[in-house]
A protein has these predicted regions:
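Short helix-start
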Residues: 30-57
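Alpha-helical DNA-recognition elements
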Residues: 26
Length: 71
């Protein structure tokens, strides 16, 4: 899919940048970092979706599911 900044990803997922930055600080996202940007793929979205379910952040789950579905 590509390499994006946290700001670009927050716009895609429709999540505040600070919230996304906090979530991406979790160790399970370390393998996606490419310098200051993040490599976004279907695997990244699936990891984010799992993390959101664990955090019970239901208002963002629909947005991530939509991105996975649309590819």
């Amino acid at each position: 899919m590509g390499v994006y900044s946290i700001k670009e990803i927050s716009l895609m997922v429709d999540m505040p940048e600070n919230t996304l930055r906090t979530y991406l600080g979790h160790y399970s996202f370390a393998k996606y970092y490419k310098g200051r940007k993040i490599e976004v793929s279907k695997e990244f979205y699936n990891t984010l979706l799992k993390y959101l379910w664990n955090k019970r952040s239901y208002k963002y789950i629909k947005n991530v599911e939509r991105l996975i579905k649309n590819g």
